[in-house]
UniProtKB/Swiss-Prot annotation:
Name the record gives this protein: Methionine import ATP-binding protein MetN
Name of a matching Pfam family: NIL
Organism: Salmonella enteritidis
InterPro entries: AAA+_ATPase (IPR003593), ABC_transporter-like_ATP-bd (IPR003439), ABC_transporter-like_CS (IPR017871), ACT-like_dom_sf (IPR045865), MetN_ABC_transporter-like (IPR050086), NIL_domain (IPR018449), P-loop_NTPase (IPR027417)
Binding site for ATP: G16, T17, S18, G19, A20, G21, K22, S23
Record membrane topology: Peripheral membrane protein
Residues of the ABC transporter domain: 2-219
Keywords: Amino-acid transport, ATP-binding, Cell inner membrane, Cell membrane, Membrane, Nucleotide-binding, Translocase, Transport
């Protein structure tokens, strides 16, 4: 059984390795795939129990974009977007204004009469997004929407999705295997392994305090800092790996110990980033006080009390 609590007007990610079941889960949310057991509820409706007209109506409230765009190559950009509105039964007189409005939103107003073959990969994905949100959906499903794009284009697509989430109030469920995607735009994340959700919660909390071994492994790839063996073996003093979370990353902790205890502080490796405007980082530091070893011990204790975690690498 897979259970994920959906929060309205949220940006939720599903993260896992290939074969974990991420895309299959996403496809159950609009009944493209039926669950072998259990129920799928979207917007309070058990979509897994619907069929025929009721299912078609429910799907009109759920947009979807794909990894490889799935555009109709013989139709223009405007015609691709208009197709979804015609399928939803829009009045002919209202389709053209809505198409123009949505193409302006996604930055393609000047590409309305172009064909997909004339577009870049990022522009094709913008058409896919425009088509998916044209009918005012409540939920937008995104199946690895940036995996076929370069880093710069991916960033612009993610920024557009965040804009749509904030401006239109659409709940976005995004499937990805890229940790940077989750950190940059998502509010919540569900981590999948072996067809099961092994952990879920606020994105910052999952990076700062991963509970499941699989999540810890994923997070370690982005935060792990390794020193060359030469430094680990030959540098004097104590080597510490310090985890900073939230406010502790904004405090002059290392300056304090240098002044208060008279120890020399040498930063050997480090990384601090911001997830949802909250700081998360790791520093590897060397503490030395050749003529006062007790000062180093006191400095380590001071750091422990003011940061999230301290690991003594050596010393």
């Amino acid at each position: 059984m897979i259970e994920i609590e959906k929060v309205c007007v949220d940006f939720t990610a599903g993260r896992g390795t290939s074969g974990a079941g991420k895309s299959t889960l996403l496809r159950t949310l609009n009944a493209l795939t039926r669950p072998s057991q259990g129920r799928v509820n979207v917007n309070g409706v058990e979509i897994s129990a619907l069929d025929g007209k009721a299912l078609r109506q429910a799907r009109q409230r759920i947009g979807m974009i794909f990894q490889h765009f799935n555009l109709m190559h013989t139709r223009t950009v405007a015609q691709n977007v208009a197709f979804s509105l015609k399928a939803a039964g829009w009045e002919r007189s209202k389709i053209a204004p809505r198409v123009a409005e949505i193409l302006t939103l996604v930055g393609l107003a000047d590409k309305a009469n172009r064909f997909p073959v004339q577009l870049s990969g990022g522009q094709k994905q913008r058409v896919g997004i425009a088509r998916a949100i044209a009918n005012h959906p409540d939920v937008l499903l995104c199946d690895e929407p940036t995996s076929a794009l370069d880093l710069e284009t991916s960033a612009t697509i993610l920024a557009l999705l965040r804009q749509i989430n904030a401006q239109l109030g659409i709940t976005i469920v995004l499937i990805t295997h890229e940790m940077n995607v989750i950190k940059s735009i998502c509010d919540r994340v569900a981590v999948m392994s072996g067809g099961k959700v092994v952990e879920s919660g606020e994105v910052f909390d999952e990076f700062a305090h991963p509970q499941h071994a699989f999540t810890q492994q994923l997070v370690s790839h982005t935060l792990n800092l390794t020193l060359p063996e030469r430094l680990r073996e030959h540098l004097p003093g104590q080597l510490l790996k310090i985890l900073f979370i939230g406010d502790s990353a904004e405090q002059p902790v290392l300056s304090e110990v240098a002044i208060k205890f008279g120890v020399a502080v040498n930063i050997l490796h480090g990384k601090i980033e911001y997830i949802g405007e909250r700081a998360l980082g790791i520093l590897v530091v060397q503490l030395t006080a050749p003529h006062n070893p007790t000062a180093v011990a006191a400095a380590v204790e001071h750091i422990r009390q003011r940061t999230a975690q301290v690991e003594v690498i050596r010393g």
